[in-house]
């Protein structure tokens, strides 16, 4: 299996990338969006019901624009019902929708700022700012791997590697290899899982290490991996499939992104 043949979702379910649930993108939106971001959507629903005139007076043809926005947001989800092509890596293939997803939060924040003279609005705005501050701190902690962000609805941080294929680009591989301290006086046999051997070779050579070979996992002493889904008779993450001792790892906010592991 290639890394795009199967996927892992927030409920620790595995799917073939051609057989993903129709709510796959919605699930990614719920579990990977900032907490304050989701709150603004809930607030907007109440605001639209109770303060619809505010938006109508502020924005020309507001109802039509809102309807168009909703259709744009629904479009990628509807695609999953009709297009047979594989979908993988969360919102990766639908990044063009992100600016549209930001419009509802923008409208909500605009309303709150414009109505700060009211006590209830002030309280809501302060609470929303606290949620944003919580997100922002966590966002900084995971630098430079912001695309691996998972919100609090994913449960314990140390178990979140089982929720999604987090570092699916293998962006942490450079840091992982730079942090490693292996003895290259003798030839080291590496295997990979979830990342390309050629990329690992490049970073090892760039570090000045040349005495190594890449072999199959059964012949390797060490394995370089992310938490991509692999196959050993059943779907399983690379981390869970290959047991051993971590020699080097890249971790952000208690979420392990990649490891070099000595195989037991």
Regions found by a protein language model. Give the residues of each.
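Membrane-interface catalytic loops of GT-C/OST-like multi-pass glycosylation enzymes that act
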Residues: 13-24, 30-33, 64-67, 80-98
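Repeat-solenoid scaffold signature
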Residues: 85-120
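Aromatic/acidic, Gly/Pro-rich catalytic loop(s) in extracytoplasmic/lumenal soluble domains
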Residues: 208-264
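Transmembrane-helix signature of polytopic, lipid-linked glycan biosynthesis machinery
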Residues: 15, 73-90, 137-146
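Signature aromatic-anchored transmembrane alpha helix within multi-pass, membrane-resident enzymes
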Residues: 49, 53-54, 62, 66-70, ...
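Hydrophobic, aromatic-rich transmembrane alpha-helices
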Residues: 28-60, 108
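Membrane-proximal, lumen/periplasm-facing interface regions of secretory-pathway glyco-
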Residues: 8-11, 127-179, 195-199
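Alpha-helical transmembrane segments of multi-pass membrane proteins
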Residues: 42, 68, 72, 99-107
């Amino acid at each position: 299996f290639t890394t795009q043949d199967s996927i892992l979702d927030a409920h620790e379910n595995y799917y073939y990338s051609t057989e993903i649930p129709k709510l796959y993108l919605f699930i990614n939106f719920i579990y990977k969006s900032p907490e304050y971001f989701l709150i603004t959507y809930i607030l907007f629903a109440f605001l639209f019901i109770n303060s619809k005139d505010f938006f109508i007076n502020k924005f020309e043809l507001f109802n039509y624009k809102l309807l168009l926005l909703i259709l744009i947001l629904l479009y990628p989800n509807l695609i999953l019902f009709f297009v047979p092509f594989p979908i993988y890596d969360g919102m990766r293939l639908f990044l063009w929708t992100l600016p549209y997803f930001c419009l509802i939060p923008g409208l909500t924040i605009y309303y709150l700022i414009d109505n700060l003279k009211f006590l209830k609005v002030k309280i809501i705005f302060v609470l929303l700012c606290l949620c944003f501050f919580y997100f922002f701190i966590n966002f900084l902690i995971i630098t430079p791997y912001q695309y691996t962000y998972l919100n609090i609805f994913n449960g314990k941080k140390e178990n979140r590697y089982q929720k999604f294929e987090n570092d699916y680009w293998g962006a942490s591989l450079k840091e992982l290899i730079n942090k490693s301290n292996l003895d290259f006086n003798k030839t080291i046999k590496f295997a990979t899982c979830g990342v390309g051997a050629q990329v690992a070779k490049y970073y090892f050579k760039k570090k000045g290490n040349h005495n190594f070979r890449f072999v199959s996992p059964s012949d390797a002493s060490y394995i370089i991996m992310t938490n991509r889904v692999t196959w050993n008779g059943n779907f399983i993450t690379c981390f869970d499939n290959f047991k051993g001792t971590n020699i080097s790892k890249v971790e952000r906010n208690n979420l392990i992104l990649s490891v070099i592991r000595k195989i037991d």
